[in-house]
Amino acid sequence: MKLIRKITIGKDYKNDAMHYSVGQDVYGGHKIDSIVEEKDKFSIYIKKGKEVLPWKDFNKNMAISISF
């Protein structure tokens, strides 16, 4: 398991990709708590208060760019 600072999903980095960074505000007042590389996927976890929840998973077969 590796921790990641930023993940970008999509073939066209500048125009059509979705960018997610640790600390970014998302969904209903939550913040991205961590982005984790697992064996066959990347997982994004969000946090609100003390509660951390799984939010999104991305298959490793997708066009992905990561920053550590």
Enumerate the predicted regions with their spans:
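Short intrinsically disordered terminal tails
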Residues: 1-2, 67-68
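A short beta-strand micro-motif
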Residues: 2-16
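Acidic, low-complexity, intrinsically disordered interaction modules
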Residues: 17-63
